[in-house]
């Protein structure tokens, strides 16, 4: 009883709101399961199903584990479920516009660790066009510590904000890394899996990979810079601890 809970318990929401969101999550899960059967013979559709599933999971977990920390996160939950429904409709038509429109976006992949869907944020550069024939620089941004950084909050931020750095002609991958663990343990594996997913989707120049982060994210950047130095063109850790060597 004397140990402080991390993350803390979220705010109370009305039972009507809880039932509303829970019903929408259940409907999304049913619709997505049916869609996956329709897409089973079309790899181009099936490969994007996790881009939809991340929204249902984020809302489900926020409700299940009481991780709604601000009143405006209820609206974020509604927006994410609406976005999931729109993506499902688009993918039914063989379209995935969120993977092509420049600016901030979110995607997902299935983790080899436990089969869960995991979210990532991605900033698509303005100059990018499909089949352009060029390779692109990729920067990574590791987030700092945030006790209320649920998947719901992470996705909400990554849907609308470019982030701390958005260099020109550069993709920027924002890692969630399973909350705030400094990209250790499962968070470290998530880094490599998210990188693999982005490389499958976009022509990334492996000679121009840069790791960045601040605070706990600086510790993450330092960790990868030290242990995998040959992988990066540069590293920019800020205000992170350096006991990873």
Model-identified regions with their sequence ranges:
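Sec-exported extracytoplasmic/periplasmic mature domains
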Residues: 30-33, 37, 60-68, 86-93, ...
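Active-site machinery of serine-nucleophile hydrolases
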Residues: 133-202
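A conserved short beta-strand
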Residues: 230-243
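Gly/Ser-rich "nucleophile elbow"/oxyanion-hole loop immediately N-terminal to the catalytic nucleophile
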Residues: 127-134, 183-216, 226-232
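Amphipathic, non-membrane alpha-helical rod segments
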Residues: 42-70
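A domain-start/cap signature at the N-terminus of enzymes
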Residues: 1-11, 65-136
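Hydrolases whose catalytic domains are alpha/beta-hydrolase-1, hotdog thioesterase
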Residues: 220-224
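Amphipathic, heptad-repeat alpha-helical segments
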Residues: 1-52
């Amino acid at each position: 009883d004397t140990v402080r809970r991390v993350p803390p318990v979220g705010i109370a929401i009305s039972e009507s709101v809880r039932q509303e969101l829970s019903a929408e999550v259940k409907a999304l899960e049913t619709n997505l399961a049916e869609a996956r059967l329709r897409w089973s013979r079309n790899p181009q559709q099936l490969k994007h199903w996790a881009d939809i599933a991340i929204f249902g999971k984020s809302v489900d977990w926020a409700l299940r584990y009481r991780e709604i920390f601000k009143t405006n996160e209820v609206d974020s939950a509604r927006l994410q479920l609406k976005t999931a429904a729109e993506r499902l409709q688009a993918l039914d038509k063989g379209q995935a516009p969120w993977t092509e429109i420049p600016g901030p976006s979110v995607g997902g992949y299935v983790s080899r660790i436990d089969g869960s869907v995991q979210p990532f944020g991605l900033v698509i550069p303005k100059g990018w066009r499909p089949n352009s024939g060029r390779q692109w620089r990729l920067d990574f941004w590791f987030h700092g510590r945030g006790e209320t950084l649920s998947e719901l909050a992470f996705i909400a931020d990554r849907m609308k904000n470019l982030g701390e750095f958005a260099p020109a002609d550069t993709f920027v991958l924002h890692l969630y890394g399973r909350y705030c663990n400094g990209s250790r343990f499962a968070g470290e594996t998530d880094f490599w899996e998210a990188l693999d997913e982005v490389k499958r989707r976009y022509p990334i120049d492996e000679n121009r990979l840069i790791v960045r982060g601040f605070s706990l994210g600086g510790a993450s950047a330092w960790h990868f810079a030290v242990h995998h130095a040959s992988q990066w063109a540069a590293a920019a850790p800020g205000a992170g601890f350096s006991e990873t060597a």
